[in-house]
Amino acid sequence: MALKIIKGNIFTSQCQTLVNTINCVGVMGAGIALECRLRYPAMYSRYLTLCKEQKIDIGLLWLFKGPDKWVLNFPTKRHWKGSSEESFFHAGLHKFAQTYRERGVTSIAFPLLGADRGGIAPSRSLEIMTEYLSTLDIDVEIYEYDPLAKDDIYASTKSWLLSQDAADIAQKTSIRIDYVYKLIEAMQHSDIHQLNQLARVEGVGIKTLEKIFVQARNQSFSEQETQQKRLF
């Protein structure tokens, strides 16, 4: 089957399974992990529990089956402050190559392991990954992160936020109104294209992002239900 190298946003992949790179101490605070935390809150909650029980470790892969995608959680660090090591990639990739069939994985999209915040050169990461993934009998995509790539949930969240009154948002989400204004201002910056990038804005914390995303998602679901009722 095909192995494709793509520069873009992994969340636009049509693959059945996406790979989320994680540490072993219960922190999903940046990059793809933060996106997964926002998109799959039940997975994040379970991840915290597994870390407390010390069941997340290098070489152990945890498959979460979400409503739209499966997510393969792949430890690339022991601690979020630490660096990735090539041996961590070998351990996880070997495990994946040995178990993907029995786990029911039919296609999968990986990020370049450790190439963003892990300290591993992208070329070296790709070399190691290709060694294990190029001979598999499923479609595999390897994504080189593109900070300019479009993000579907950012677009929908931005559309909702900019269509609302700031005071109403503050009341519905229990976010201080000055933080709401910071978010509104940040979402109009030309250099922000993805939800995880908002975390770098001063005064915008992860909890704030979670509250905004949940409110936007719930509003979207409510509108969809209303529209469906009108069809009958």
Report each predicted region and the residues it spans.
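Macrodomain-like recognition of ADP-ribose-binding/processing modules
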Residues: 1-232
